[in-house]
């Protein structure tokens, strides 16, 4: 059952947040949504962390005529994987984004103008520290679990390492301890597309740049899919509207990338895209530690990992390495490799496959 009609909330923290870069950001506004009810001892809270261009709208609709529900609606609600009859589910928009939380598109209170490129570089660790402020605001000392895929999985890892006393468990899907040179290079090409769009104006645009961001998003969509899923979804089908020997004729996969690229321009800020891409590239759970082992030595909660066979952005071996490292340290870690043709996006689509394992894991966590 769906959670039904929901409402976005926000909170502004007047206290400054010291970032990993050493710079200070404040005040900070966080947009968030909650589903279900917090129990009397505040022990039933689950935090869901979104991916790169996600938002706090995890589930439900804002109105009856809303065309589609939140981005992971299928797993949230009464009787669903994240059962809102039992648990209090929270999702917040990360700092640096453009869906209600403080980011480069926000107005700098010191200047009265948009931050744009004066916004400080942020990290995934900074995002999690901001989320900790939200939990303090909600009166939640400890989470039952923190769950996320891709960049959301990175946030789950940061919670487990940076705030081990505040999480009873963590669930990380389709993620990595640090992006590979290949992943960084793909983001670099996406950045070039934006930097070389004259309408970007070095971040000082009034109207969201169109062509550069659309191309950057198209590159992203390629990384989210897989060879197998592209064959299944598009094959080598040519657009029926174009002549085969029309120079500007397009294959169906080209139309897909064009449509999704330009559609994205209408809903996401270009500078936010760049800042979050930078945060992804900089991510290393062992940052500030001597090694991955040193970072994971801080973990006290069990962690459940999921990787997907066709994910070439964050390949399974990267996930397995984390689980193996934790086990070698005597920590509790599960690793599940899910067969899937959906590529990196599988974490959003294969919920029926991994749901039984997550249910079993959370039941064990609750039993202690």
Curated annotation (Swiss-Prot):
The active site is at residues 150, 311, 344. The keyword Cytoplasm applies. Its EC number is 2.3.1.31. GO terms for biological process: methionine biosynthetic process. GO terms for cellular component: cytoplasm. InterPro entries: AB_hydrolase_1, AB_hydrolase_fold, HAT_MetX-like. It is found in: Cytoplasm. SUPFAM superfamilies: alpha/beta-Hydrolases (SSF53474). Keywords: Acyltransferase, Amino-acid biosynthesis, Cytoplasm, Methionine biosynthesis, Transferase. One of its GO terms (molecular function) is homoserine O-acetyltransferase activity. Residues 44-350 form the AB hydrolase-1 domain. Pathway: Amino-acid biosynthesis; L-methionine biosynthesis via de novo pathway; O-acetyl-L-homoserine from L-homoserine: step 1/1. Signal peptide: none annotated. Substrate binds at residues 217, 345. It catalyses: L-homoserine + acetyl-CoA = O-acetyl-L-homoserine + CoA. Homodimer. Transfers an acetyl group from acetyl-CoA to L-homoserine, forming acetyl-L-homoserine. Belongs to the AB hydrolase superfamily. MetX family. HAMAP family: MetX_acyltransf. This is Homoserine O-acetyltransferase.
């Amino acid at each position: 059952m769906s959670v039904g009609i929901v409402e976005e909330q926000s909170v502004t923290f007047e206290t400054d947040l010291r970032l990993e870069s050493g710079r200070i950001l404040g005040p900070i506004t966080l947009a968030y949504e909650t589903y279900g009810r917090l129990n009397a001892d505040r022990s039933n809270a689950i935090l869901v962390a979104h991916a790169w261009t996600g938002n706090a709208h995890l589930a439900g609709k804002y109105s009856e005529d809303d065309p589609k529900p939140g981005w992971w609606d299928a797993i949230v609600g009464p009787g669903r994987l994240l059962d809102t009859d039992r648990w209090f589910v929270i999702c917040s928009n990360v700092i640096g984004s453009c869906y209600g939380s403080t980011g480069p598109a926000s107005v700098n209170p010191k200047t009265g103008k948009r931050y744009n490129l004066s916004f400080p570089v942020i990290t995934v660790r900074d995002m999690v520290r901001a989320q900790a402020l939200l939990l303090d605001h909600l009166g939640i000392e400890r989470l039952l679990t923190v769950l996320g895929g891709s960049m959301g999985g990175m946030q789950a890892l940061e919670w487990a390492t940076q705030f081990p006393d505040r999480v009873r468990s963590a669930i990380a899907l389709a993620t990595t301890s640090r992006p590979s040179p290949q992943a960084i290079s793909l983001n670099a090409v996406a950045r070039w597309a934006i930097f070389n769009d004259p309408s970007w104006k070095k971040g000082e645009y009034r109207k969201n740049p169109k062509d550069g961001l659309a191309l950057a998003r198209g590159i992203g969509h390629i990384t989210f899919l897989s060879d197998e899923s592209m064959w299944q979804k598009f094959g080598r089908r040519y657009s029926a509207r174009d002549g085969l020997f029309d120079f500007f004729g397009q294959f169906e996969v080209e139309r897909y990338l064009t449509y999704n690229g330009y559609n994205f321009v209408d809903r996401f800020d270009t500078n936010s895209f760049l800042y979050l891409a930078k945060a992804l590239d900089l991510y290393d759970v062992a940052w500030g530690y001597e090694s991955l082992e040193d970072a994971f030595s801080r973990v006290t909660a069990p962690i459940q990992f999921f990787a997907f066979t066709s994910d070439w952005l964050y390949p399974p071996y990267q996930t397995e390495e984390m689980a193996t490292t934790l086990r070698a340290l005597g920590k509790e870690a599960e690793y599940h490799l899910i067969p899937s043709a959906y590529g990196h996006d599988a974490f959003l689509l294969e919920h029926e496959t991994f749901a039984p394992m997550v249910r079993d894991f959370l039941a064990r966590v609750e039993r202690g």
